[in-house]
Amino acid sequence: MKLTFLGHSAFLLENQEVSLVIDPFLTGNPMAPHDIPVKPNYILVSHGHGDHLGDAIRLAKETSATIVSVFELANYCARQGVLTHPMHIGGSHNFGPMKVKLTQALHGNSTGSDRGPAEYLGNPCGFLIYLGNKTIYHAGDTGLFGDMQLIGDLNSIDVALLPIGDNFTMGPTDALEAVKMLKPQRVIPMHYNTWPLISQDPTAFKKAVEQATTTQVDILQPGEFLKI
């Protein structure tokens, strides 16, 4: 299975059966590689902010992929004429060989729309993805929360994708505490260095995590991938 970093919080997860993109912020993303074909079966969207909903509608129309998100955001996407699967936090669903479970995230969830400058779209979320005997946790945009301990206790996480940019999400110090609770085998930092406001040193984060835990940190540049 191949996990490719597309910049910011966007990832492409592929095996022989499934192609899945998470938070596909590609157009307008200064970090996004534009030479990687993104033709997903499924599109997971953690919340409606432009740097996460991103190109989801366009990709869904081009590929007939299904957008998976919280109920309100899925309904918003359905109004744009695409296939959706609505869920809510704590719920899980099998999509062929893949299971997806929605988790809590501490953030906002709105987008500009024809109903006004912003439309509230329910709660934001993270995702647990179970595919090919592996478990991947994409935290979405979130601050640190205590139930990360439960997520770690109830799952054997192979790879955790965690924001470290601070300001809009948890920063490196809180992300280290998240690693301690989640206990993943590997962590990939995300949601940093896209703009000056979320500038961070991922090497310092890697050093702190690997000194304090047994978790390995993989710093991926946009376009790089990890074989899981």
Swiss-Prot record:
The UniProt record lists the keyword RNA-binding: no
Keywords, comma-separated and alphabetical: Hydrolase
This protein's name: UPF0173 metal-dependent hydrolase Dred_1740
A single MF term (Gene Ontology): hydrolase activity
Family, similarity comment: Belongs to the UPF0173 family.
